[in-house]
Amino acid sequence: MLAAEPELAGARNEKGQSALLLTAYSGNKELCDVLMACGVPLELHEAAALGRLERVKQLVEEMPAEAKTYSPDGFPVFALAAVFGHLEVAEYLFSKGADINAAATNGTGYNALTGAVASGHTAIVSWLLANGADPNYRYGNGFSPLLTAAANGHLGIVSILLASGADLHVKTNDGKTALGFAQERGQAEVAEFLRSHGAA
């Protein structure tokens, strides 16, 4: 179908999300490659999500304020680079004025740190925290990066967050703790680590 109608690769839904961006969200790298081969020029949020640093640089150099913009579905371009694990892109956007704590405008409240934590990108989490990301940022139902890391079993990230000042005793709006999430999800190593740091 794409061979006959390559313009479909640039199609967008009612939220303004392109086929390429939705494919990136799904993690299907092979299909992303197929869509990009159709020659549709990448917009900044797509280039950031896909880690295309040269395209990101080209677009930001043409319009510097773009480094601080959002995708059509409300995510900071900077956060998309972080959630998909593209440290060089995140570093570049930050150097051009992207707000390290910028939150999504779509009701999720996600930012670069929450996305990198959820995706398990330890190096990016460390870099974000070293450059001013808030380790106690709250979003959704009172979630924090530590709660997400504990629930997902990311022990290294839990350690980095605590070393960066994350509140060990933080609770969601319905009273769940990092230790509670770790135990509930069977994350035994994380649970033991949290207990060794005073969680109860």
Residue ranges and their predicted role:
Residues 30-31, 55, 88-89, 123-124, ...:
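Conserved ankyrin/ankyrin-like repeat signature
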Residues 48-89, 98:
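Conserved small-residue-rich
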Residues 22-28, 46-52, 80-86, 115-121, ...:
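Ankyrin repeat A-helix N-terminal signature
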Residues 2-5, 28, 37-40, 52, ...:
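Alpha-helix initiation and capping sites
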Residues 12-18, 41-46, 69-77, 103-112, ...:
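Ankyrin-repeat boundary/"N-cap" motif
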Residues 136-184:
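Ankyrin-repeat and related helical/solenoid repeat scaffolds used for protein-protein interactions
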Residues 2-7, 34-40, 60-65, 91-99, ...:
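Ankyrin repeat domain, specifically the short helix-to-loop turn at the C-terminus of the second helix
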Residues 17-32, 36, 169-200:
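Leucine-rich solenoid repeat scaffolds
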